[in-house]
């Protein structure tokens, strides 16, 4: 980081960022991430104590992947290396290698506590049933590929998910509840009980014993993204190299860029004057706290005009462009409904956090290389200072996606986002066709006042169209919640059957 010098947080005294600026007046200022919290580990003042790793309170972690240090404050390690945690600080922890005794920062999502389930390749922590299905059905897996995950419904319990094949449905995933014995053991069927999950896995690898398939190999998992650089929230423009223009919107451009020569990112450049720096920074600090795997991750900001918004890079671009592409236009209906379910999941999180998107449409959904849909630009609409966008007569106002009460009275709520989601469903099922084809904005407003709603496209199932029509109820309070919409879309093809298999 050039002119940064390493300082570590000290319990009880003044706190220093890892990347505090030096006295050099030309050194660009890095401002810490507003969401990071610091927890000194039990060994933080124990630096030279012999036998670290033997105390009862020590947090010993093992590396799940290799990591090559980018900065001199970081600690390189190989898969399988063990380290003692000195300080838990957001996504980067300070640790000491038990082998080399070297200290430095490590990405916390690259390690797991020794002897924890997370060290097992078949254990997927905190993954939902639906995401388990998405991952097991992804390329690279086979019949009998499996994972054990935390139960969504019963805290402290687990579920087994297995890839299967059904002549009618094709590739599918079956789920089994793993039940717990009073003595701490585990079973799927009461006739076969095990003292550990490892024993359970070994047993069902030898034979299916009533499961749909014999367990073959753990579900393929990719190395997680490294956490964003520690304490790099407000960053200098010079740290970014804009490389390829990905698109241009009403308020700026989107670029593929490299941060500090090592991290691929997307950069949204805002036209000067499109928003006040103070309002933007206040909103960005709030947006930074909204972290969910179906929301585009906000990494950093440049707060001098022109404002830059730095986010994770999404390889397939906007959902709108993807749906119109050769690859997107070949996606079958179940995949389109899966896209819709992913977006509903992200919006259910926004709803739960009492936040509002205000500009939900296919152009503001981004698609990853593995076809994960993530919501982008949440909250930005609120701070735009452009009458062309904020006034309903303005050329940039997204009339066709906007709920009547937001058009007429300017009142945006999560229920107006639900209306927009109904329009977004129509965009998805028509592969990116503009809503209300052939109608101008004033014609749309007049038609809505008469009670007009877009008709059902030929390829759209009645049940999906019913969701759209519920999203377009005139009275906002009669529209469904995103939580409800997510539950319907998640189980769109399986609502009539039990999600979990009966005991074998």
From Swiss-Prot:
Alphabetical keyword list: ATP-binding, Cell junction, Cell membrane, Cytoplasm, Cytoplasmic vesicle, Cytoskeleton, Exocytosis, Golgi apparatus, Immunity, Inflammatory response, Innate immunity, Kinase, Lipoprotein, Lysosome, Membrane, Myristate, Nucleotide-binding, Nucleus, Palmitate, Phagocytosis, Phosphoprotein, Proto-oncogene, SH2 domain, SH3 domain, Transferase, Tyrosine-protein kinase, Ubl conjugation
Its membrane topology: Lipid-anchor
Residues at the active site: 359 (proton acceptor)
Pfam families, per database record: PK_Tyr_Ser-Thr, SH2, SH3_1
Reaction it catalyzes: L-tyrosyl-[protein] + ATP = O-phospho-L-tyrosyl-[protein] + ADP + H(+)
Compartments where located: Cytoplasmic vesicle, Secretory vesicle; Cytoplasm, Cytosol; Cell membrane; Membrane, Caveola
GO biological process: exocytosis; inflammatory response; innate immune response; peptidyl-tyrosine phosphorylation; phagocytosis; positive regulation of cell population proliferation; protein autophosphorylation; regulation of actin cytoskeleton organization
Keyword Signal included in the entry's annotation: no
Biased composition (Polar residues): 34-49
Domain Protein kinase: 240-493
Superkingdom of source: Eukaryota
Family: Belongs to the protein kinase superfamily. Tyr protein kinase family. SRC subfamily.
This protein's name: Tyrosine-protein kinase HCK
């Amino acid at each position: 980081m050039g002119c940064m010098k390493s300082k570590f947080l000290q319990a009880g005294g003044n706190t220093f960022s890892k990347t505090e600026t030096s006295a050099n007046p030309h050194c660009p200022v890095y401002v810490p991430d507003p969401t990071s919290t610091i927890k000194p580990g039990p060994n933080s003042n124990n630096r030279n104590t012999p036998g670290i790793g033997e105390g009862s309170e020590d947090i010993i972690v093992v590396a799940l992947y290799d990591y090559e240090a980018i900065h001199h404050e970081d600690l390189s390690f190989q898969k399988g290396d063990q380290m003692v945690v000195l300080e838990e600080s957001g996504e980067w922890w300070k640790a000491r290698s038990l082998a080399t005794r070297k200290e430095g920062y490590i990405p916390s999502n690259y390690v797991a506590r020794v002897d924890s389930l997370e060290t097992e390749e078949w254990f997927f922590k905190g993954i939902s049933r639906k995401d388990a299905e998405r991952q097991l059905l992804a390329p690279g897996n086979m019949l009998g590929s499996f994972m054990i995950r935390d139960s969504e419904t019963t805290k402290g319990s687990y579920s087994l998910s297995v890839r299967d094949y059904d002549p009618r449905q094709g590739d599918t995933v079956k789920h089994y509840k793993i039940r717990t014995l009073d003595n701490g053991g585990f079973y799927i069927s009461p006739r076969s009980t095990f003292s550990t999950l490892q024993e359970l896995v070994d047993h069902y690898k030898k034979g299916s014993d009533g499961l749909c398939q014999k367990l073959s190999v753990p579900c393929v998992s990719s190395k997680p993204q490294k956490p964003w650089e520690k304490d790099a929230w407000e960053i200098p423009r010079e740290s970014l190299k804009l490389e390829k223009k990905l698109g241009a919107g009403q308020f700026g451009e989107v670029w593929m860029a490299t941060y500090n020569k090592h991290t691929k990112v997307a950069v949204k450049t805002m036209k000067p004057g499109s928003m006040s720096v103070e309002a933007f920074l206040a909103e960005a600090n709030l947006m930074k706290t909204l972290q969910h795997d179906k929301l585009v991750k906000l990494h950093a900001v440049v707060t001098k005009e022109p404002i830059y918004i730095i986010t994770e890079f999404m390889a397939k671009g906007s959902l709108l462009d993807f749906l119109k592409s050769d690859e997107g236009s070949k996606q079958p209906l179940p995949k389109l409904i899966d896209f819709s379910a992913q977006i509903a999941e992200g919006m259910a999180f926004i709803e739960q956090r009492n936040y509002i998107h205000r500009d939900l449409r296919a152009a503001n959904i981004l698609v990853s290389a593995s076809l994960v849909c993530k919501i982008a630009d949440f909250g930005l609409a609120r701070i735009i200072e452009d009458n062309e966008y904020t006034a309903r007569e303005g050329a940039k106002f997204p009339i066709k996606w906007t709920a009547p009460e937001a058009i007429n009275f300017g009142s945006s709520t999560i229920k107006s986002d639900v209306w927009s989601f109904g329009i977004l469903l129509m965009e998805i099922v028509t592969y990116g066709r503009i809503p209300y084809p052939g109608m101008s904005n004033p014609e749309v407003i007049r038609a809505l006042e008469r009670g007009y709603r877009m008709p059902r496209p030929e390829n759209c199932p009645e049940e999906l169209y019913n969701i759209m029509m519920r999203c377009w109820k005139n009275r906002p309070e009669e529209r469904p919640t995103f939580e409800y919409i997510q539950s319907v879309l998640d189980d769109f093809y399986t609502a009539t059957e039990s999600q979990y298999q009966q005991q074998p």
